[in-house]
Swiss-Prot record:
Organism annotation: Mycobacterium tuberculosis (strain ATCC 25618 / H37Rv)
Described purpose of this protein according to its UniProt entry: Aspartyl-tRNA synthetase with relaxed tRNA specificity since it is able to aspartylate not only its cognate tRNA(Asp) but also tRNA(Asn). Reaction proceeds in two steps: L-aspartate is first activated by ATP to form Asp-AMP and then transferred to the acceptor end of tRNA(Asp/Asn).
Region (Aspartate): 197-200
EC number assigned by the record: 6.1.1.23
Pfam families to which the protein is assigned, alphabetical: GAD, tRNA-synt_2, tRNA_anti-codon
Keywords recorded for this protein, A-Z: Aminoacyl-tRNA synthetase, ATP-binding, Cytoplasm, Ligase, Nucleotide-binding, Protein biosynthesis
Catalytic reaction list: tRNA(Asx) + L-aspartate + ATP = L-aspartyl-tRNA(Asx) + AMP + diphosphate
Record site: Important for tRNA non-discrimination: 31, 83
Protein name in the entry: Aspartate--tRNA(Asp/Asn) ligase
């Protein structure tokens, strides 16, 4: 071993011991010929002092030290002189009086100082330096503890950890695949899996009964600020269970995870129906740390002469004290709405005397003006924001406005935790809505799956898949924490006939379903058990636990929001020879024979 002790674990009780430490120079200070360094390793920091004037060789070496040199130091642990203790660090009562010094690796001029802020792109380009800093390193170490805690819970319940393939067949699952040319089969491609969904279902058919995996997943999505092309899930599947069983295990996992940061999740976690969440909060990922619920106004304005409110849906959200906002701020709300694809955000100001002002108020009837504040629960001094139009998009705008209002008014306690299960979502959604939202619709039909094509309908809706498609409810559940969906799952279809009916609704005829999912349909013919599961977004979950806004902070080597790795400069072009060898331009054999 190149060291005998961890620097950050030395204490007063170690005084008098001869130790060998190894790590990096966090700081170097020269005080009249006596040199001090803060030596940092994974355990923390210890002060090392070079003060022996007789040992000129060691002193000369110490004079050469600069920040981030990697060194090994031998010496004796001593109590610091009176008045020199540092209560800011765990080792602040001691120091190591060095007797030898070995430079293990010199450090070039740093691209940024590790104790100063740096831009994200620079941090990612030199991520190996960024991870020497306390907060980034702590986030990665927390992730390891999170993994271990989840594994411990699942081991207690006899889950089997199984690795599924990471190169497989391209199957439509709701996003674009990353494709990998198969050199030995020119013109054919593997795909990186968007999830282990199909394989974990096959494992249930295989009799594994309880499976889990900390799985890498890949989706070729459009660039978004806080998405990664590769991400991690805690993936679980169970046989002979219903939704209640899966929710119970999931709550046990979550309880164990949040215990790592000293918080006890009250269980059972409350539940809300999807339809109720959309009606009250405008989203299926409601942040319940604050109120400000949406108010339905469609019936209130049913006879309105104001053309903007002659819409399928009219809703409102109240901003407490918002009537005092200057005109420039109110105009800024319009820009805020336009950035989200809407024409604007109508508003009414409630004056201190209860009269209504703003551009909308003059278009309302006397009866509407008289009853509006009471209907939406507004008080003098408040601002009422409205959205009118299609139900889903109008509610979504108000839901976003609700969160924006809470942020601007400081209504969200950053130390609070609010968990909720969102249950009973629709099984299908219009395919055009899915594609407009940037998703990839499975099949060519008018409907596509809200979650994925393998989600089972609630048993009472099974007979109405074709006759009342838009109303069918899924036997599915999402877990939401502080407005973030951190996991989602469902009971799965385990019968071939039902799976084929669901495919048909989505525009996959029997021949196409057989071509793309024949292996799954065939497996269902061999005594497939009822089964279901859940997958947790492991990056987001860990980021919440670490108190980080971005998932990039809990990924060792993340990509930027544009999908680029500044460290390795990926993605990168390939050579002409690589392209030729890959067979990427070849026609597959079955096409050549046709």
């Amino acid at each position: 071993m190149l060291r005998s002790h961890a620097a950050g674990l030395l204490r007063e009780g170690d005084a008098g011991q001869q130790v060998t430490l190894a790590g990096w120079v966090a700081r170097r200070r020269d005080h009249g010929g006596v040199i001090f360094i803060d030596l940092r390793d994974a355990s923390g920091i210890a002060q090392v002092v070079f003060r022996d004037p007789q040992d000129t060789e060691v002193l000369a070496q110490a004079h050469r030290l600069r920040a981030e040199f990697c060194v090994s130091v031998a010496g004796v642990v001593e109590i610091r002189p009176e008045g020199n203790a540092n209560p800011e660090i765990a080792t602040g009562e001691i120091e190591v009086n060095a007797t030898s010094l070995t430079v293990l690796g010199e450090c070039a001029p740093l691209p940024f100082q590790l104790d100063e802020p740096a831009g994200e792109e620079l941090r990612l380009k030199y991520r190996y330096l960024d991870l020497r800093r306390d907060d980034p390193a702590a986030a990665i170490r927390l992730r390891s503890r999170v993994n271990a805690a989840a594994r411990a819970v699942l081991a207690r319940h006899d889950f089997v950890e199984i690795e599924t393939p990471t190169i497989t067949r391209s199957t439509p699952e709701g996003a674009r695949d990353f494709l990998v040319p198969a050199r030995l089969h020119p013109g054919s491609f593997y795909a990186l899996p968007q999830s282990p969904q199909l394989f974990k279902q096959l494992l249930m058919v295989a009799g594994m009964e309880r499976y889990y995996q900390i799985a890498r997943c890949y989706r070729d999505e459009d660039f978004r600020a806080d998405r990664q092309p590769e991400f991690t899930q805690l993936d679980m599947e169970m046989s002979f269970v219903d939704a209640e069983d899966i929710i119970a295990i999931s709550e046990e996992v979550l309880t164990e995870l949040w215990a790592l940061i000293g918080y006890r999740i009250p269980t059972p976690i409350p539940r809300i129906g999807y339809a109720e969440a959309m009606r009250r909060f405008g989203t299926d990922k409601p942040d319940l740390r604050f109120g400000l619920e949406l108010v339905e106004c469609t019936d209130f304005f049913s006879d309105t002469t104001f053309r903007v409110f002659q819409a399928p849906y009219v809703g409102a959200v109240v901003m407490p004290g918002g009537a005092s906002q200057p005109r420039r701020t109110l105009d800024g709300w319009q820009d805020w709405a336009k950035q989200r694809g809407h024409r604007g955000l109508a508003y009414v100001l409630v004056a201190e005397d209860g009269t209504l002002g703003g551009p909308v108020a003059k278009n309302l009837t006397e009866a509407e003006r008289t009853g509006l504040a009471d209907h939406v629960g507004a008080k003098p001094g408040d601002c009422i924001f409205f959205s009118a139009g299609p139900v889903k998009s109008s509610r979504a705008l108000l839901g976003a406005a609700r969160v924006e209002i809470a942020n601007r008014l400081g209504l969200i306690d950053p130390d609070a935790w609010a968990f909720v299960w969102v249950v009973d979502p629709p099984l299908f959604e219009p395919a055009d809505e899915a594609t407009a939202a940037g998703e990839v619709a499975v099949g060519s039909g008018a409907w596509t799956a809200v979650h994925h094509a393998f989600t089972a309908p609630k048993p009472e809706w099974e007979d109405r898949i074709e006759s009342d498609t838009g109303s069918v409810l899924a036997d599915a559940y999402d877990i939401v924490c502080n407005g973030h969906e951190i996991g989602g799952g469902s009971v799965r279809i385990h019968r071939r006939d039902i799976q084929e009916r669901v495919f048909a609704v989505m525009g996959l005829d029997k021949a196409e379903a057989e071509e793309k999912f024949g292996f799954l349909l065939e497996a269902f013919m061999f005594g497939a058990p009822p089964h279901g599961g859940i997958a947790f977004g492991w990056d987001r979950t860990t980021a919440l636990l670490a108190g980080m806004d971005s998932i990039r902070e809990v990924i060792a080597f993340p990509k930027t929001g544009g999908g680029v790795d500044p460290l390795t400069d990926a993605p990168a072009p390939i050579t002409a020879q690589q392209r030729k060898e890959s067979g990427i331009d070849a026609q597959p054999k079955r096409v050549q024979q046709a």
